[in-house]
Every structure is written in C-alpha cells, then in structure tokens.
A protein has these predicted regions:
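Single conserved hydrophobic/aromatic residue that forms the stacking wall/gate
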Residues: 1-12
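Catalytic alpha/beta core domains of metabolic enzymes, predominantly
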Residues: 10-126, 130-141, 157
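Domain-level signature for soluble enzymes in the chorismate/prephenate branch of the shikimate pathway
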Residues: 154-248
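Extended, hydrophobic interaction surfaces within ordered domains
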Residues: 98-152, 200-228, 232-236, 244
Length: 248
C-alpha cells in the first residue's frame, strides 16, 4: 500500500484500515517541503501497528522556475535519515525530474546519498503512455540506466578518511568560535541601537553584506545562493538576539 502526497493530512482512515495488517507501506513525501508532516504520517501508522514502513521521496512542489518537475531538496530526506536512521528511503526520479533525460543523473544522486532504492517509470511505448509520458523510459533504457549506476559503500572508512574528518571537526570548532564572537558583537550593536533608539533591521547594511559575501564566496568556489542561505540564517539569529536586547 502507499500513502500519497495529498493524503498525508488525513492518515487516520489509512491508519484504521491498516491496523493489524502485516504489509509494507510506502509513504510519499508531502507536496510542500514539510518534514514534520511527513514524519508525523509515518509515526501515526507505526503507532497503529504498521512495522514495515518506507519513505518515498518524489521531490517538492515550488513556484520557482526549475528544470525539475519537483525540486529534489535533498536536505529534507537527509534530515529524515538523520532522525530515523533505520527507515528505508526510496527515490522516485521519474516524478522528481518529470523528463526522461533527468532520470539517470537523479538516480545516481540518490545512490550517492545512500538511498535504499529507486522507483523508475518504464513503458514499452513511452510516448503513447496515458499519463506522465515525458518521464517514462523504455525497458532497454531503464536497463542501461541501472547498469551504469555506481552504488557506493556507506560505512567503510579508511585512515585517510578519518584524518580528513578530523580536520573538518577542527575547522567546525573554529567556525563555531568565530560565530560566537560575531554574535557577541551583534549583541553589542543591539545595545547601541537600543540606547540610540535605532531599528534592529538595517536593510542597506544587510544587502551590502549579502552582495559582498556572495561575490567573495564565488571566488572561493561556492555558489552565491549557498552563501546567501548561510548569511540569511546568521542574520536571522542576529536579529533575534538584538530584538531580545531592545525589548528587555
């Protein structure tokens, strides 16, 4: 059985119907990127006695223009795996990509991220398929896609890898220390704003930071979007702490 994306908000009927039935149940992700809703549906089924549950990642709807039918947003299934490590997560690259030429690279990305399986739509005559024709492949094409997949080992580690991870741990410690110092200065700025009756949000300054650090990030091989996301999170925490000071 499967619980579809649009049915996640009403799992109770399925929950009652599946009570005491020993069958595998696949729970598709919600249409919108809502990890708590996805997890909540699986938790309800588990409480009803369903033991064999797997998650199906089909991507998420978005108003953004994208090459994908549904945005992968890999960070959401990655977080799902972190929270429920024993849960099998299966990727549906057909619905995610929406185009047959995107299926192979999405399959490989899913394998690289440690997904337990794939659901790929295949049809003997894809162009004549009654639904989703553009995302279906011939059986021979599916065989070619699967034969070229590289399935990686999740757990085997070497001394070299352990040493590299130790370096990352040290750098993360330094990052946390620097972030702590940055926020301390932000709190001092918040105190200054309170004493001089200034607003917390200084839009021009924030835009200046995003522009400057975005360009700097690109020079270091990072995407401007990733840098913007990082500084947006830092800015939100800075604003939160300054609001606390101003309203104290």
């Amino acid at each position: 059985d499967s619980v579809a994306s649009r049915g996640l908000g009403d799992v109770y009927k399925r929950q009652d119907a599946l009570q005491g039935v020993d069958i595998p149940v696949f729970v598709k992700n919600p249409v919108n990127p809502d990890l708590e809703l996805w997890m909540g549906a699986m938790e309800r089924l588990n409480r009803a006695g369903v033991q064999r549950i797997a998650a199906i990642h089909r991507g998420f709807s978005s108003y953004e223009k994208s090459m994908y039918r549904n945005l992968p947003m890999w960070q959401i299934p990655i977080e799902l795996h972190r929270r429920i490590p024993q849960l099998p997560i299966i990727c549906d690259p057909s619905h995610m990509g929406g185009k047959r030429e995107l299926i192979a690279p999405l399959c490989q990305q899913a394998m690289d991220l440690g997904f337990e399986g794939l659901i790929v739509e295949s049809h003997c005559n894809p162009n004549a398929a009654w639904s989703d024709a553009k995302q279906q492949v011939l059986p021979a094409e599916l065989d070619a896609i699967l034969s070229k997949l590289v399935v990686r080992d999740e757990y085997t580690t070497t001394d070299d890898l352990q040493n590299l991870r130790a370096e990352i741990d040290q750098l993360d410690d330094q990052l946390m220390n620097l972030l702590s110092k940055r926020l301390r200065i932000c709190r001092e700025i918040g105190q200054y704003k309170k004493e001089h009756n200034l607003t917390v949000l200084q839009s021009n300054r924030y835009s200046e930071i995003l522009d400057k650090r975005g360009k700097q990030g690109v020079q270091y091989g990072l995407s401007a979007e990733s840098v913007a996301n990082i500084f947006e999170e830092i800015h939100q925490e800075s604003v939160r702490q300054q609001l606390k000071i101003i309203n104290s």
